[in-house]
């Protein structure tokens, strides 16, 4: 892929009339413009044209004069920012750094890790990596190729490179911020020099990331002076207009249209088909994107939490400079459902709990305990009274829940559909519910407001070639994006074959969207459907077993250029499917295990093997 200062890719071309004009833009700018306008409808294009005209009149895009023969890189160097992102958090931090660098007069450019060629690091002077970690220490899908290149013997020596790494992760996991640690080590091994110490940021990363960016910029101001690059200023403005003005920080207040249980009466699971009305928002999304949902904590849980530490909820606290009651802060701003190791260790110290202190000294036992308990369970381990400040110091800030979108806008218009598995279980005789899933399933009435935003996922997209075959593996709620894929392929009249592999517990109770799949089979949009219901026979059968059973056909489709998609559980299913795919390639391709692993790795690099796992 050509190196471009972009974060989206389409493969479309500019209208002939525009392409024929004598362009004052350089190649990078023209390519960025091309990839942006092809995403917009006529109304959006009209708005954008007016927006840029207004900017030109207000000199909002004015840049220092560059004389003939002088290049935009005439400053003492430039900053290259590379993001490795799975859910969009790293991308957001990288975009913020880009904007701040440009405002400081630093020439800066931004790259998706999948669009950056590792060998080009030898040409750089200053690079910042912002990297999230996927699953159990894996690099995000968009960074797999770069990650592999930098640890290989092909990577160039980098004695002239100065760098910084910001890692994003979740300390609940064993391999916390592993991808950031990897990039930091790779660059050090290649002879690069650290500008600043690596930051390993936890789930509530915003404040720490902001301070780290300030530290980086204070150093870069001394090292990178001169005019900001024309391409950087212009391309940032264009990329901003290509996105909806609604975001994680500024969500859209939509309304809940439908919350319908789609598992049977006797199912052990409650799975909901959710429809949300986006009318008049102007929000657009593509198959493969996710919807971020901001939720409120249940009043019953808030009250139980307050009671467990001897507080009334009327205490006043400061949240983001605003004075709120403690009850309101816990309802809207803090994570009070999922426990985490840091919470357990801090509460052990506050409560002087021998049991929890002993537990905190065993990392594996601590992690296991935090996984199976909720915040309320930890606080009830010891009967102590806390102040409001002490309680909030234990808690993480609330973060939105991301759900794979289960609809295509070409089919549903100004709606967005989700497939939500309600988290519900018992702990020591008491019911425990998930925060976001119970909010959507139980707390909201139809017509109630819900704050949402679209999180684009460029690492889980339909191929631009409508003739390409698709193999889609989506057990349980992992079926969601493939509903959007099939809707989109039908509406586009795509000729490519479609094969779906679905699995769950039982055929009669857990076959999600069964009627729809049968309709698509009958119409020919879906060419093949294989199912695995684990509890319908003595021996449990899962989707990976169906793959192995159909190994010859899987290999045939791959040889025909099929794209292979997996969505769902990262801890077991995705790993088992991955190993099954390698086995298929090994057996059917006549390769040894190492060669089969390399083949599958090449599929991922070519974006013919894409995963949306959690």
Swiss-Prot record:
<dbReference type="InterPro" id="IPR003097">
    <property type="entry name" value="CysJ-like_FAD-binding"/>
</dbReference>
<feature type="binding site">
    <location>
        <position position="576"/>
    </location>
    <ligand>
        <name>NADP(+)</name>
    </ligand>
</feature>
<comment type="pathway">
    <text>Sulfur metabolism; hydrogen sulfide biosynthesis; hydrogen sulfide from sulfite (NADPH route): step 1/1.</text>
</comment>
<dbReference type="InterPro" id="IPR029758">
    <property type="entry name" value="CysJ_Proteobact"/>
</dbReference>
<keyword id="KW-0560">Oxidoreductase</keyword>
<feature type="binding site">
    <location>
        <position position="371"/>
    </location>
    <ligand>
        <name>FAD</name>
    </ligand>
</feature>
<feature type="binding site">
    <location>
        <begin position="434"/>
        <end position="437"/>
    </location>
    <ligand>
        <name>FAD</name>
    </ligand>
</feature>
<feature type="binding site">
    <location>
        <begin position="419"/>
        <end position="421"/>
    </location>
    <ligand>
        <name>FAD</name>
    </ligand>
</feature>
<feature type="binding site">
    <location>
        <begin position="540"/>
        <end position="544"/>
    </location>
    <ligand>
        <name>NADP(+)</name>
    </ligand>
</feature>
<keyword id="KW-0249">Electron transport</keyword>
<dbReference type="InterPro" id="IPR001094">
    <property type="entry name" value="Flavdoxin-like"/>
</dbReference>
<keyword id="KW-0274">FAD</keyword>
<keyword id="KW-0285">Flavoprotein</keyword>
<comment type="subunit">
    <text>Alpha(8)-beta(8). The alpha component is a flavoprotein, the beta component is a hemoprotein.</text>
</comment>
<dbReference type="InterPro" id="IPR029039">
    <property type="entry name" value="Flavoprotein-like_sf"/>
</dbReference>
<dbReference type="Pfam" id="PF00175">
    <property type="entry name" value="NAD_binding_1"/>
</dbReference>
<feature type="binding site">
    <location>
        <begin position="534"/>
        <end position="535"/>
    </location>
    <ligand>
        <name>NADP(+)</name>
    </ligand>
</feature>
<feature type="domain" description="Flavodoxin-like">
    <location>
        <begin position="79"/>
        <end position="217"/>
    </location>
</feature>
<feature type="binding site">
    <location>
        <position position="425"/>
    </location>
    <ligand>
        <name>FAD</name>
    </ligand>
</feature>
<feature type="domain" description="FAD-binding FR-type">
    <location>
        <begin position="249"/>
        <end position="463"/>
    </location>
</feature>
<dbReference type="GO" id="GO:0000103">
    <property type="term" value="P:sulfate assimilation"/>
</dbReference>
<comment type="function">
    <text>Component of the sulfite reductase complex that catalyzes the 6-electron reduction of sulfite to sulfide. This is one of several activities required for the biosynthesis of L-cysteine from sulfate. The flavoprotein component catalyzes the electron flow from NADPH -&gt; FAD -&gt; FMN to the hemoprotein component.</text>
</comment>
<feature type="binding site">
    <location>
        <begin position="168"/>
        <end position="177"/>
    </location>
    <ligand>
        <name>FMN</name>
    </ligand>
</feature>
<dbReference type="GO" id="GO:0070814">
    <property type="term" value="P:hydrogen sulfide biosynthetic process"/>
</dbReference>
<dbReference type="InterPro" id="IPR039261">
    <property type="entry name" value="FNR_nucleotide-bd"/>
</dbReference>
<dbReference type="GO" id="GO:0016491">
    <property type="term" value="F:oxidoreductase activity"/>
</dbReference>
<comment type="similarity">
    <text>Belongs to the NADPH-dependent sulphite reductase flavoprotein subunit CysJ family.</text>
</comment>
<keyword id="KW-0028">Amino-acid biosynthesis</keyword>
<dbReference type="Pfam" id="PF00667">
    <property type="entry name" value="FAD_binding_1"/>
</dbReference>
<feature type="binding site">
    <location>
        <position position="614"/>
    </location>
    <ligand>
        <name>FAD</name>
    </ligand>
</feature>
<keyword id="KW-0198">Cysteine biosynthesis</keyword>
<comment type="similarity">
    <text>In the N-terminal section; belongs to the flavodoxin family.</text>
</comment>
<feature type="binding site">
    <location>
        <begin position="132"/>
        <end position="135"/>
    </location>
    <ligand>
        <name>FMN</name>
    </ligand>
</feature>
<keyword id="KW-0288">FMN</keyword>
<dbReference type="GO" id="GO:0005829">
    <property type="term" value="C:cytosol"/>
</dbReference>
<dbReference type="InterPro" id="IPR008254">
    <property type="entry name" value="Flavodoxin/NO_synth"/>
</dbReference>
<dbReference type="GO" id="GO:0010181">
    <property type="term" value="F:FMN binding"/>
</dbReference>
<feature type="binding site">
    <location>
        <position position="337"/>
    </location>
    <ligand>
        <name>FAD</name>
    </ligand>
</feature>
<dbReference type="GO" id="GO:0019344">
    <property type="term" value="P:cysteine biosynthetic process"/>
</dbReference>
<dbReference type="InterPro" id="IPR001433">
    <property type="entry name" value="OxRdtase_FAD/NAD-bd"/>
</dbReference>
<protein>
    <recommendedName>
        <fullName>Sulfite reductase [NADPH] flavoprotein alpha-component</fullName>
        <ecNumber>1.8.1.2</ecNumber>
    </recommendedName>
</protein>
<keyword id="KW-0521">NADP</keyword>
């Amino acid at each position: 892929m050509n190196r471009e200062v972009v974060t989206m890719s389409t493969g479309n071309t500019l209208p002939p009339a525009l392409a024929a004009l004598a362009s004052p833009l350089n190649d990078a700018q023209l390519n960025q413009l091309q990839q942006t306008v092809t995403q917009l409808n006529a109304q959006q294009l009209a708005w954008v044209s007016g927006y840029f005209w207004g900017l030109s009149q207000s000199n909002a895009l004015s840049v220092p004069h560059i004389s003939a023969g002088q290049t935009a890189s005439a400053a003492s160097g430039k900053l290259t920012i590379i993001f490795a992102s799975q859910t969009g958090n790293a991308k957001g931090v990288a975009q913020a750094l880009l904007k701040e660098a440009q405002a400081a007069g630093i020439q800066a450019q931004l790259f998706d890790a999948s669009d950056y060629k590792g060998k080009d690091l030898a040409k750089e002077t200053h690079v910042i990596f912002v990297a999230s970690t996927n699953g159990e220490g894996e690099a995000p899908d968009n960074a797999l190729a770069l990650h592999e290149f930098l640890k290989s013997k092909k990577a160039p020596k980098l004695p002239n490179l100065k760098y910084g790494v910001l890692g994003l992760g979740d300390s609940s996991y064993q391999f916390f911020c592993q991808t950031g640690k990897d990039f930091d080590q790779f660059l050090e091994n290649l002879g690069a020099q650290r500008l600043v110490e690596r930051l390993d940021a936890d789930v509530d990363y915003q404040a720490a990331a902001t301070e780290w960016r300030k530290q980086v910029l204070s150093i870069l101001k001394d090292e990178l002076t001169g005019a900001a690059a024309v391409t950087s200023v212009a391309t940032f403005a264009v990329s901003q207009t290509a996105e909806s003005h609604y975001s994680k920080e500024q969500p859209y207040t939509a309304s809940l249209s439908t919350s319908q249980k789609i598992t049977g009466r006797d199912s052990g699971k409650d799975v909901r088909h959710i429809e949300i009305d986006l009318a008049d928002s102007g929000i657009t999304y593509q198959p493969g994107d996710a919807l971020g949902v901001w939720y409120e904590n249940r009043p019953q849980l808030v009250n139980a939490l307050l009671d467990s530490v001897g507080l009334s909820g009327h205490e006043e606290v400061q949240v983001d400079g605003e004075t709120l009651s403690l009850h309101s802060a816990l309802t809207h701003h803090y994570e009070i459902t999922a426990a985490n190791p840091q919470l357990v260790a801090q509460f052990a110290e506050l409560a002087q709990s021998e049991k929890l202190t002993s537990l905190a000294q065993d990392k594996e036992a601590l992690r296991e305990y935090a996984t199976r308990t909720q915040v309320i369970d930890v606080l009830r381990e010891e009967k102590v009274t806390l102040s409001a400040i002490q309680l909030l110091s234990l808690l993480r800030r609330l973060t939105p829940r991301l759900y794979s979108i289960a609809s295509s806008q070409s089919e549903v218009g100004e709606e967005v559909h989700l497939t939500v598995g309600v988290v519900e279980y018992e702990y020591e005789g008491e019911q425990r519910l998930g925060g976001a899933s119970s909010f959507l399933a139980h707390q909201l009435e139809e017509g109630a407001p819900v704050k949402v935003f679209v999180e684009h996922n460029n690492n889980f997209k339909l191929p631009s070639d409508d003739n390409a075959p698709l193999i889609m593996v989506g057990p349980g709620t992992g079926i969601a994006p493939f509903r959007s894929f099939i809707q989109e392929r039908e509406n586009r009249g795509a000729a490519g074959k479609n094969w779906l592999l679905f699995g769950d517990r039982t055929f009669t109770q857990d076959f999600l969207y069964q009627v729809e799949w049968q309709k698509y089979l009958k119409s020919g949009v879906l060419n093949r459907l294989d199912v695995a219901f684990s509890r319908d026979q003595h021996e449990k059968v899962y989707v990976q077993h169906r793959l192995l059973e159909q190994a010859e056909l899987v290999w045939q489709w791959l040889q025909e250029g099929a794209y292979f998609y997996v969505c769902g559980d990262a801890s077991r299913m995705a790993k088992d499917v991955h190993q099954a795919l390698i086995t298929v390639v090994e057996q059917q391709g006549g390769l040894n295990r190492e060669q089969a692993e390399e083949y599958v790795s090449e599929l991922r690099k070519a974006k013919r093997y894409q995963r949306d796992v959690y």
